[in-house]
Regions:
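Contiguous, often N-terminal, cationic amphipathic patches that form binding interfaces
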Residues: 1-43, 47, 51, 56-70
Length: 70
C-alpha cells in the first residue's frame, strides 16, 4: 500500500495526523539534515503499522513523500 506523507521538520512535538486513508501529516523534532528526519518518519510509521515493512519510495529531499507500507 502506498501512502502520501507530508512532513514538518524541527517541530516542538512529534505528532501524526491521518487526513485520509492514504494521506498522513507527520511532525518530527529532527532537522532535515543528514537524513535524520526521514529516518524518524519511517520509525513513526513503523510504530503505527507493527509487523509491516516500511520503505521510502519518493521524496527523499522533499517534505511531500510517498511511502510503501506492506
Amino acid at each position: 500500500m502506498l501512502i502520501k506523507v507530508r512532513v514538518t521538520t524541527d517541530a516542538r512535538a512529534e505528532k501524526v495526523v491521518k487526513k485520509s486513508d492514504d494521506l498522513y501529516v507527520v511532525s518530527v523534532k529532527e532537522k532535515a539534515e543528514r537524513n535524520m528526519a526521514n529516518r524518524r518518519v519511517i520509525e513513526i510509521i513503523k510504530e503505527k503499522n507493527p509487523g509491516k515493512r516500511v520503505k521510502l519510495i519518493k521524496g527523499h529531499h522533499s517534505p511531500a513523500k510517498i511511502v510503501e507500507v506492506g
